[in-house]
Amino acid sequence: MHRVLLTSLLFFILNSGRAAEDKYSELGATYNGTICVDADTGIVLSESTADSLGHPASVTKLMTFLLILEDARDQQLNLNSLVKISKEATQIGGSQVWLAVGEEFTVKDLLYALMLQSANDSAVALALTRAPTVKEFVERMNTRAKELGMTNTHFVSPHGLTYGAGPHDTTTARDLAKLCVQLTTLKDAFTFTYCKEFNFRPGLKSVRLNNHNHLLNSYPGCDGFKTGWTVAANASIVTTARNNNHRVIAVVLGCDSPSGAKIAQRVRDQIAGKLMTKGFEKLAVYDAEKAKLLTLTHRDTPKGKGATPSAPKKSDSEEKTEEKGWLEALFTF
């Protein structure tokens, strides 16, 4: 009975009212796939062709980012340690911070360059701190992807900059969501993904970095993660926001527009914002219905002499499992 009520209420709320007028026309726009998930449980809140393959472009850097932060968490790496720049790191094109052979930067500074400027040279420099060769680091990326259940993902680079016929990094919207659910468990991640500006290499050769994720400024509560674009991959974004007690993650993979690349990037952001808004709306329904059911349960619980003893306090893992069960009951229909 409660399941029917939840389903009916959810359908009514999500289909009532008129949506705000879009700033950018989505007419003719296409994408490989989209998805929105609850970050705490991984429950899917909405999806569209989320298992279709696409090229992530610079969104690839999120796996490089994850591996570096996990190594730091496991005390295999100090974010304040210095990295000496090799020749190989200076020979990559595309977006960069123009690293020079012999320069030294902290791992932390290279992460800012990676996440704000989407610096390909920084991605190579970071990869070479954790493996003897870039190829071996990419093998680590693919191993970690399998561990996270990213079954349709294959990386060929630490940065996502590929040319012509490839090979290209390949993934799906669903797999990228799995990656970012893991990212949200790392306390240091948002230090970099929420940073809007950073002064890299202070001095005569200083580079002012500006975060490419425009939703940080336009979407309330947005604090990550990463955008990407190449001619071969089109425009992608994995983004996240927190609202009250909930965090959602939205992915738009391979967005293209007949109006050109710049509009495709704006449409990509617009779609991602809508996905997060709808996700929060669903979670608000969940909160309201859970509160109602808990109130009913509390009201019907015997009190006084002969009452059933209260249940022992649940552990964090038990509460998370219960939360996931509530969400599955609400959204699986």
Q: Predicted segment positions?
A:
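Hydrophobic alpha-helical membrane context
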Residues: 14-15, 73, 290
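Hydrophobic h-region of N-terminal signal peptides that target proteins for export
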Residues: 8-18
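Alpha-helical structural signal
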Residues: 10, 65, 111-112, 180, ...
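Domain-terminus/edge residues, biased toward the C-terminal soluble/receptor-binding domains
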Residues: 150-154, 165-333
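Sec-dependent signal peptide recognition
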Residues: 2-7
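Active-site-adjacent loops and short helices of periplasmic peptidoglycan-processing enzymes
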Residues: 19-174, 184-187
